[in-house]
């Protein structure tokens, strides 16, 4: 096999039991410069067992492209729906040999079972590698080496973590239970300055225990997310960060800190349930086209936005407020940058709201920068004998740009109307009309005279 495609098709059973550190059940060793690709198709069973000591060159299926004559060629493994690959605790299930000296791309398609008792089931080296799964299962972690790698799972089961190394990597996981995936790691960091941009998309699933690490951009599509450690880091540059789309829910619990930007589409929700002590932070900017809410029946939760806040028409911000005097407890939105756009404020009176006269008002939105957004109340806000309305700017500082609920109107001091300046003939014209009317009445005389 020195030219063209090296091809192996297994529909039977291949079982190798050996202690050797450099043992493979099925191996393709491509050394020729005339080789164009190497492909293994498995619809049967391939098993490597008997290993005791782990070695990076021990694998049930292995590609080797080493030597001075080696070239970068596609290395393809297809595991069909009936295919089974099993490896012991000293072995990988599928790997590109550590002796590889080039950037051959490993392309793995799995609809069957790939499993290893070792921590890693799949390991590749430098190259633009691909793993695709539409059914079946992957039992063991995956490491795709440096390069622009792609990991795509649209079905089946994954038990193990996914690690992608340096490069601009893409991972898409949909309709897969993430509870058995401890970590999804995009590689180097969350900065775009190095040219490596990693994107993770999670669709039709939920995140509760999975750590999401080193992704410049994370897109949640019809997905519920709750951080297992109350933090998440994403890209901080414009166009990167955490994106909630298609009815996704970010359940922020009682405390959550996002390093990066947050974008909420019209059907998605950022939700905090802090019971009055919730603390939530977004280090970057927030674009809200959907709903941000800390309504949980208790006032006092705080969302702090380190960058700008942009409200898209139709967006809402929901809070709990004790409706009383100026010192009343309320949920609060703090924006350290600028605000723009429009959002609707929905205020739910906290239990026991007495209603009282305010002076300055109850501050519900605190803007440090330019306050260019327009917030409007969704409906009447009432407690006791009082009704509260929403005002921009304070009383003592009428240009502070903050937003207040007030139960008193600030009177407008009337101004005297301007005095008009008439031309000289105007007074004669007006007095002449009066004189003519009087003369006419005098000419009528009395009834007796007539």
Segments predicted by a language model, with ranges:
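Extracellular beta-strand/beta-solenoid scaffold signature
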Residues: 1, 17-33, 50-74, 87-100, ...
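Right-handed parallel beta-helix
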Residues: 5-17, 37-50, 74-86, 105-115, ...
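Outer membrane beta-barrel translocator domains of Type V secretion systems
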Residues: 15, 412-450
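Glycine-centered small-residue motifs that form tight turns
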Residues: 23-26, 55-61, 91-94, 131, ...
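Short, solvent-exposed linear patches
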Residues: 34, 102, 125-127, 146-149, ...
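A broad structural signal for short, well-ordered beta-strand segments within beta-sheet-rich domains
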Residues: 35-37, 72-74, 102-103, 215, ...
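Alpha-helix capping and inter-helical loop/turn segments
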Residues: 100-102, 310-311
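Extracellular beta-solenoid/beta-roll
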Residues: 138-139, 148-152, 157-337, 341-342, ...
């Amino acid at each position: 096999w020195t030219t063209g495609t090296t091809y192996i098709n297994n529909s039977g059973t291949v079982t190798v039991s050996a202690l050797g550190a450099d043992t493979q059940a099925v191996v393709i060793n491509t050394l020729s410069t005339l080789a164009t690709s190497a492909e293994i198709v498995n619809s049967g069973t391939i098993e490597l067992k008997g290993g005791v000591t782990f070695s990076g060159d021990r694998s049930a299926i292995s590609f080797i492209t080493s030597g001075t004559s080696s070239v970068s060629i596609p290395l393809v493994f297809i595991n069909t729906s009936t295919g089974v690959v099993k490896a012991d605790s000293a072995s990988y299930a599928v790997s590109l040999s550590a002796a590889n000296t080039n950037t051959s791309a490993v392309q793995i398609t799995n609809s069957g079972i790939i499993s290893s008792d070792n921590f890693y089931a799949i390991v590749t080296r430098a190259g633009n590698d691909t793993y695709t799964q539409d059914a079946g299962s992957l039992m063991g972690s995956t490491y795709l080496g440096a390069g622009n790698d792609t990991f795509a799972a649209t079905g089946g089961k994954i038990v193990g973590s996914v690690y992608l190394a340096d490069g601009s990597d893409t991972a898409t996981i949909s309709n897969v239970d993430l509870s058995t995936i401890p970590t999804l790691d995009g590689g180097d960091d969350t900065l775009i300055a190095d040219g490596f941009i990693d994107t993770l998309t999670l669709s039709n699933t939920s995140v509760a225990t999975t750590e999401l690490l080193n992704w410049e951009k994370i897109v949640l599509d019809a997905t519920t997310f709750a951080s297992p450690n109350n933090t998440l880091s994403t890209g901080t540059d414009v166009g990167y960060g955490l994106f909630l789309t298609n009815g996704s829910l970010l359940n922020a619990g009682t405390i959550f800190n996002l390093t990066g930007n947050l974008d909420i589409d019209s059907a998605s929700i950022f939700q905090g349930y802090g019971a009055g002590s919730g603390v939530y932070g977004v280090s970057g900017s927030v674009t809200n086209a959907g709903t941000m809410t800390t309504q949980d029946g208790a006032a006092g939760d705080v969302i702090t936005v380190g960058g700008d806040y942009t409200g898209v028409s139709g967006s809402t911000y929901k809070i709990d407020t004790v409706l009383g005097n100026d010192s009343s407890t309320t949920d609060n939105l703090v924006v350290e940058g600028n605000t723009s756009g429009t959002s609707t404020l929905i205020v739910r009176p906290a239990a026991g709201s007495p209603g009282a006269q305010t002076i300055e008002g109850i501050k519900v939105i605190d803007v440090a920068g330019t306050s260019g957004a327009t917030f409007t109340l969704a409906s009447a806000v009432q407690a006791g004998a009082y009704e509260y309305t929403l005002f921009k700017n304070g009383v003592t500082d009428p240009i502070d740009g903050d937003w207040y609920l007030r139960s008193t109107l600030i009177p407008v001091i009337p101004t005297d109307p301007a005095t008009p300046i008439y031309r000289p003939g105007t007074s004669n014209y007006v007095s002449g009309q009066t004189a003519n009317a009087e003369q006419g009445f005098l000419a009528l005389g009395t009834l007796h005279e007539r």
